[in-house]
Amino acid sequence: MKSSMQLISTLFFLVILVVAPGMKMVVEGQPQLCETKSLNYRGLCLKWRSCKRVCISEGFPDGRCKGFFNNKCVCRKPCALLSTEN
């Protein structure tokens, strides 16, 4: 009985590890963030403050370094919700 519970626990943990990275937490009332690669930032993005400064100059409210080996400066803004009302 103990080994079957351990097996079930292990399988559940593995399923969570596989499924969790693809999940997004949606908080009601907060807009989704849209991201685009900065047009003016050059080189590897190592300092998020300099990335943010460049993104602000491009008209975005925020910017962050994104990536692990190949860091890029990514500018972010709240996504516009399209209204379907006429």
Swiss-Prot record:
A biological-process GO annotation: killing of cells of another organism
Record PTM Pyrrolidone carboxylic acid, positions in chain: Q30
Gene3D superfamilies the UniProt entry points to: Knottin, scorpion toxin-like
InterPro entries: Defensin_plant, Scorpion_toxin-like, Scorpion_toxin-like_sf
Signal sequence annotation: 1-29
Pfam families in the record: Gamma-thionin
Keywords linked to the UniProt accession: Antimicrobial, Disulfide bond, Fungicide, Plant defense, Pyrrolidone carboxylic acid, Secreted, Signal
Annotated disulfide bonds: C34-C79, C45-C65, C51-C73, C55-C75
Cellular component GO terms, alphabetical: extracellular region
Keyword Signal attached: yes
Subcellular location: Secreted
Family: Belongs to the DEFL family.
Name of this chain's protein: Putative defensin-like protein 9
Organism: Arabidopsis thaliana (Mouse-ear cress)
